[in-house]
Amino acid sequence: MISNIRIGLFVLAIVFVVLVFFYWKNEELYEEKKQRIRKTWYGLFIISVTVYFMIKGIDLTLWKNLLMFTAMVIFVDIAFILTPNISEIWGAKFSDIGKTVQSIKRSLIASKARGEIYTTIIQNVNPAVFGTMEWHTEEEYTKSLNAFLDSYGEKIGAKIVVFEAAKELNTNFRGIRSQFSIIVPLEHIEQLNEQKAVQVENVGIIPAKIVSDVFIVIDGKKNNLQDRDFENVYNLTIHHSYFSK
């Protein structure tokens, strides 16, 4: 039995090395297949113990060796397969702590960066320009607003286009569909009519009825949109209205 335990420990060591190699070679695939690996791991353990008892018979005097072998199997599972992203132990489920923390950290950093961009744009505006502009048509207003918002779009790596709301509603969002290749669902149209921002895929649509009724579209396909982007763009639109006579 002692020699068999040694063989078992040797096999455990080989499997452990294989798991480490698999993890470092393709971490994403490993995380995706982790639960299957666990099921296979314990399945092989149960089969090996069952086959051993069938061949050698049950000898309870060797319970210490069996317990040690079982502990090693569980140790490999907890120490490597589950750790550091423990998702389930004895029926108690936990979130993927490591990834969650990293995701929150990235969001906070991105939000802080967006805030700094917004502040810089506001600080660079010359107050002497306030109350000096006049827009005779909606088209003139949308072009002026678009030019003002372009500075924010360039900083975050996103395309921003301002559309006349009435024209888009009357043409089933033809302008937005042609430029951004998206279809605005009916429920989103209802939200826009209620002056609520929506997001279709990774394209944000912000309704603004400050000077004129417009839809501000942010294309975040190259750089994922943040919630802060919607707030910043709307606030910049308000700031732009100060230019009006």
Curated annotation (Swiss-Prot):
Main subcellular location: membrane
InterPro entries named among the record's database cross-references: SpoIISA_toxin
Localization in the cell: Cell membrane
TM ranges: 2-22, 43-63, 66-86
GO biological process: sporulation resulting in formation of a cellular spore
Keywords per UniProt: Cell membrane, Membrane, Sporulation, Toxin-antitoxin system, Transmembrane, Transmembrane helix
Membrane topology, record value: Multi-pass membrane protein
Pfam families membership: SpoIISA_toxin
Any one Gene Ontology cellular component term annotated for this protein: plasma membrane
Keyword hit for Metal-binding: no
Function noted in UniProt: Toxic component of a type II toxin-antitoxin (TA) system. Upon expression in E.coli growth ceases. Upon coexpression with SpoIISB in E.coli normal growth is restored.
Record's subunit section: Probably forms a complex with SpoIISB in which SpoIISB neutralizes the toxic activity.
Family according to the record: Belongs to the SpoIISA toxin family.
Protein name (Swiss-Prot/TrEMBL): Stage II sporulation protein SA
Organism of provenance: Bacillus cereus (strain ATCC 14579 / DSM 31 / CCUG 7414 / JCM 2152 / NBRC 15305 / NCIMB 9373 / NCTC 2599 / NRRL B-3711)
